[in-house]
Amino acid sequence: ENKIVYLEILKDDDYVVLKISDNAGGIADNISAKIYEPYFTTKHKAQGTGIGLFMSRRIVEELFNGTLSNENREFEVENEKYFGVSFSIRIKLVV
């Protein structure tokens, strides 16, 4: 299967939204609420520390006063449908 990472940049009222989606099947419901906790990982400790999403969310919220969220969703690229997780970064536009 071809691995896809799909980027979308959208304007939503006074906000810019960056969506980063993949086709890796999504995040299981039983861990979705935990992925932003520090040191949470589903990988072996030698492959990750579990602080990437925690730090990403803190940067978006504290430095940019924005939000970082995720959802499992279907998306389409060049008439092909894919399913995976989508991370959305939402930041207020500054004029």
Please describe what each predicted stretch is.
Residues 2-18:
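Short beta-strand-loop-beta element adjacent to the nucleotide/active-site pocket used for signaling
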Residues 64-78:
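Glycine-rich ATP-binding loops of the HATPase_c
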Residues 60-61:
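Detector for a conserved hydrophobic position within an alpha-helical segment of the HATPase_c
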Residues 78-94:
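Short C-terminal beta-strand
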Residues 22:
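Acidic ATP/Mg2+-coordinating residue in the GHKL
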Residues 27-39:
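Short conserved segment of the HATPase_c
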Residues 52, 56-57:
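Short alpha-helical Gxxx[C/S/T] motif in the catalytic ATP-binding
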Residues 39-49, 64:
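Glycine-rich ATP-lid/hinge loop adjacent to the conserved G-boxes
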